[in-house]
């Protein structure tokens, strides 16, 4: 793993990326393990029913950023990252990640859950406006909305992957009687295949920006 990575700086809030995968089988795996999920960012800010389960990272219950666990850099944290026992229980998810998702060095890979009636309080996760965070919608009820701080909203269609600009304030409200399951993938690299896929999506969706080399952040 390199200590730096190409990041795409953009004012766009998100773009859609199309992957060739069966999201329904992955959704079944995410849902089947619900009893194993851990509360995410407990006490950090207002949220209800926000939980996570780690497939790759510092441990099944280590759902937060590596800084929360005493590491000084992503490079040091990466040395201790591994596929967890949860990954062993998710063959369809692993097939997608290892054979279809263009990444050689994974950071955190997590199932994320917002329970029925739950919400994620408004927050932002990056000081720089980056299109980098991959959020794959697996189960997203109709009355569950991603809300931007400026008032815009986004319905994240099941089976669709989104590259999110989490520099901007955002929140999630699940006003339904069904749980919301997503798969979030953090890449520690920017492979040629990723850039090809990403650049094609930007061109199709008229999204502009520029690549910059930064120290790996996640």
Region roles according to the model:
Residues 1-100:
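Non-heme Fe(II)/2-oxoglutarate
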Residues 97-116:
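A short glycine-rich, His/Asp/Glu-containing loop-to-beta-strand
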Residues 105-106, 119-133:
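A short beta-loop-beta micro-motif enriched in histidine and acidic residues
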Residues 113-115, 128-143:
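Short, conserved beta-strand element in jelly-roll/cupin
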Residues 116-118, 159, 167:
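Tight coil/turn sites that cap or link beta-strands
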Residues 120-123, 145-146, 164-177, 184:
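Short beta-strand His + acidic residue motifs that chelate non-heme Fe in jelly-roll/DSBH
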Residues 132-137, 161-163, 177-195:
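A short hydrophobic beta-strand segment most commonly corresponding to one strand
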Residues 137-157:
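A short beta-strand-loop-beta hairpin characteristic of the jelly-roll/cupin
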